[in-house]
A protein has these predicted regions:
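Short beta-strand/loop motif that positions the catalytic acidic residue
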Residues: 228, 234-236, 240
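Mobile cap/lid helix-loop segments that gate and shape the active-site cleft of serine hydrolases
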Residues: 185-223
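Conserved alpha/beta-hydrolase
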Residues: 106-123
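Alpha/beta-hydrolase active-site loop
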Residues: 128-148
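N-terminal cap/lid segment of alpha/beta-hydrolase-fold proteins
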Residues: 41-76
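C-terminal catalytic histidine-bearing segment of alpha/beta-hydrolase fold enzymes
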Residues: 249, 253-299
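The serine-hydrolase catalytic nucleophile loop
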Residues: 91-102, 116, 246
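Primarily recognizes the serine-hydrolase "nucleophile elbow" in alpha/beta-hydrolase
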Residues: 143-149, 153-196
Length: 299
């Protein structure tokens, strides 16, 4: 299957290159704490040199995908912990970094945001979080692990929305992932399909024909290994109509049965988009999980 034509790819890359400086400057201004009149600036500051593109290509069979992302370097020295954020449906990777990049300051860790295939400025199609999303997450982890400024044993993965599905499938397949945050995801597509509202079904049909085989391949619960030695934080809104709370509760139970250390944070009045509430819960989890060497991503 032809994913992208050469002319389209070159045009998009040219546009991305022309706008790269502006995007990095915009992200840097947010991280600098630049504010309006009468507001107190942030006590700590990052220059634009701390924000760099984190883009790469990943191949799956005959298809090749270009992955868009950004990396925010913490001002700390040495090999630091890191968090990889798998973004999907919450804007592009630049917006992800604007929202979460400040963790480089507040937690003293490296922050990488990528858009999984089919989202943001990453090439697609997504095909309902197909195998290409997991392949992109695998490669991103390997790239981070190879960096001299990252402790390869202290890397966490944080998936948001459909990115949580990709993160969960990565957890199913890669025993190196020791700490994972799953936010607002749908983890049992086999059960979700008959319960999903018409709008959600139409969105799924637009991406892929939802046969039982396809739904099982993309269901985190259906692909869980017999045992898991990882820490998992599940964050979810009780009023989420795109991914019902029962999806998160069912996954939490399945993970505990397999030996995972699971904690949950459910917001009774929240829907699919959790905003600052999710960042606060995730920050607490990351601080504890990556505080000491030897936790996060096994070598």
């Amino acid at each position: 299957m032809e994913i992208r034509r050469g002319g389209e790819l070159n045009s998009r890359r040219l546009g991305a290159a022309l706008g790269m400086r502006g995007v990095i400057l915009g992200v840097a201004l947010v991280l600098l704490g630049v504010s309006g009149c009468g507001r107190t600036p942030a006590p700590k500051m990052l220059s634009s040199s701390f924000v760099k593109p984190f883009t790469f290509d990943v191949s799956l069979g005959p298809n090749r995908y270009h992955i868009d992302g950004y990396f925010v370097r913490s001002p700390g020295s040495g090999r630091l912990p890191a968090v990889l954020i798998l973004n999907a449906g919450q804007g592009d990777a630049a917006r992800c970094v604007k929202t979460h990049g400040n963790l480089a300051l507040t937690l003293g860790m490296q922050v990488a945001c990528i858009s999984i295939p089919g989202y943001g400025h990453s090439s697609g199609p997504s095909r309902l979080v197909g195998p290409q999303a997991v392949a992109a997450a695998h490669k991103a982890l390997n790239l981070l692990k190879a960096r001299p400024d990252i402790d390869p044993k202290r890397i966490a993965v944080w998936g948001i929305g459909d990115g949580a599905v990709a993160a969960g499938l990565l957890m199913d397949q890669d025993p190196r992932v020791g700490n994972i945050i799953l936010q607002s995801g749908a983890y049992d597509l086999v059960r979700l399909w008959p319960e999903a509202p018409l709008v959600a079904k139409l969105e799924m049909l637009h991406q892929v024909w939802p046969s039982r085989r396809v739904l099982r391949e993309r269901s985190v619960i259906e692909n869980l290994p017999p045992r898991l030695k990882c820490r998992v934080l599940i964050i979810h809104g009780a009023r989420d109509h795109r991914a019902p709370l029962s999806q998160a509760e069912r996954l939490a139970g399945a993970l505990r049965m397999r030996g995972a250390r699971v904690s949950t944070t459910y917001f009774p009045r929240a829907d699919h988009d959790l905003g600052a509430n999710a960042i606060k819960a995730a920050s607490k989890f990351l601080s504890a999980a990556l505080a000491e060497p030897g936790h996060g991503l096994a070598s």
